[in-house]
Amino acid sequence: MRSWFLLCGRLSNIGVFYPTGNGIDWGIHLARMGVSVSAVSVVGKDEYGDKMREALAAEGFDISHLRVEDGDTSVMLMALKDGVDRVHLEAIDGVMETYRPNEDDRAFILEHDIIHTDLFGNCLDLLPEWHDAGKTVVMDFSVFSQDPEYACENHFPYVDYAFMSFEDDTPELRDWVRHAQELGPRVAVATLGEKGSIAYDGERFYECGIVPAEKVVNTVGAGDSYIAGFTKGVIDGLDIPACMKAGAELSSRVIGSFEPY
């Protein structure tokens, strides 16, 4: 497995911080389900960087390619609102701003079967390399799949499982999901928050509702956990509906806990 962009989340109004980031949350879930996971990225020479390396090593990650460089670890400052909702205040890029995988990192990546990335890991130009090498690429486009700034249509052809985030299941959304899948992915998935998710595989659409949670403590990690559950289903050879259900079940468990995994 492979995870890329990582940062520490710090809840500034209650003095709590924890390792997070799309790929990190995803990787921690998979590691806890018995999947071998590696992190290829960078942290700074600071307390956050030390804690990140310690935490990921404790989760069983291979951190041999988690570099340590002069500067600050990437941090997302958040606040806790009404005891539940996390509000993003500021993103501090730190050493991630200039990070690039070196040749050794790139060779290490290609030793793995599944690669997870997003739009912010400074590695979009490597997507064709991974695709040509026959790797399974899982990519989180979040809410930006239709944003012209990110030119996601240029990336879809090199992705196997494309995940996007929207609010409502509309005919226009289905047209977009179908269009995205036709550009290359085996499956394109749109998560819809409390309205569940839809997926398209080139032949038909699939729908999956949510799994009700006993309580809602944190919705920040819902998307990453859904992708992790879906990915584990792919690894286990499950069909698309079962993968979607696995994602929904894991997401339901996560929103009932304080941390995003």
Residues covered by each model-derived region:
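Conserved beta-alpha-beta core of the PfkB/ribokinase-like small-molecule kinase fold
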Residues: I114-H179, K195-S197
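Conserved phosphate-binding/catalytic region of the ribokinase-like
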Residues: R174-Y261
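Positively charged, low-complexity intrinsically disordered leader regions
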Residues: M1-Y18
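Hydrophobic anchor at the start of a short beta-strand
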Residues: S3, V37, I63-S64, V137, ...
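Histidine-anchored nucleotide/phosphate-binding helix
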Residues: G23-R32
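Conserved N-terminal subdomain of the carbohydrate kinase-like
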Residues: N13-I14, V35-D113
